[in-house]
Amino acid sequence: MWKVRGSSSVKYKSKSLFRFLPLILLVGMAFCPRVQSSQANVAYFAGGCFWCTEAVFQQAPGVTSVVSGYMQKAETVQVTFDPAKTTYDKLLNLFWRAHDPTEVDAQGPDTGKQYRSALFFVDEQQHLAAEKSKAQAQKSYSKSIATEITRAGSFRPAPENHQNFCRKNPNNPYVRQIIEPKLKKLGLKKP
């Protein structure tokens, strides 16, 4: 409120600061460092048995850790990555190549809803990237992609005997017959 001068009585004129709000926000955004969500470096992928998915993402450049677990009753891997060395888009590309996204509630010999294909996004940027990459990946398949794309919920790590399964169990028949051929097809080495 402003006092109007030259008046015998005190009058106040209301000036709204709201008209300056866009300018204030723009100036603030220009001079303040951009804050990234701590979740921006985390991605969740469900591509069948988490032993396979874990082994694939452990070989991806820029990935700093992979944890096998469960999200929304699907075997899922939590992938932490360094955005200076890789991008979510590159990880999505690897995800599509690492499994058959047209299979419903199954991957290879593993069947059941827990083996479904799913992408769990942590923010709107990941959501948009996942939808875009799914549309792009669909061009490579004659059948419809069954991968669900949904907001990430609570992630529950699997017991320790499921973590780093391929590294800990290199002679396991599942590793030899399922994981190793998958890694070879992708041009990746066994972890």
Please give the residue ranges for each predicted region.
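N-terminal secretory signal peptides that target proteins for export/translocation
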Residues: 1-15
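Flexible coil/turn and secondary-structure edge motifs
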Residues: 2, 31-191
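Bacterial N-terminal signal peptides
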Residues: 11-12, 19-30
